[in-house]
């Protein structure tokens, strides 16, 4: 399954999500950001590639709303996007962030 992890800045959360699956034989993962200055921005090609899209936070950062508006012409976009509810409180690849990601992904049947 192709997994896309999206946060705002593409610095910590989404990159950590991608890193979790770097050695996976079951899943392929990529990451991107929605922010103006991020190095890898989410685009139509990534969205179409993904079977599931995990945004980190809707409440404070509006990531799901951004994705739904920007990519509204992509069929079944609503079904692909899942909100993990992880705030930008963790450094990249920190044990706490890894544990939080694993716990949230498990709810969607994704095991690392």
Named regions from a protein language model:
Residues 41-45, 65, 95-99:
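Generic alpha-helical secondary structure signal
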Residues 33, 57, 84-87:
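Residues at the C-termini of beta-strands that transition into short coil/loop
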Residues 1-52, 102-112:
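Conserved active-site segments centered on acidic
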Residues 45-66:
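Short, structured active-site "lid" loops
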Residues 68-112:
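Phosphate-binding/catalytic loops
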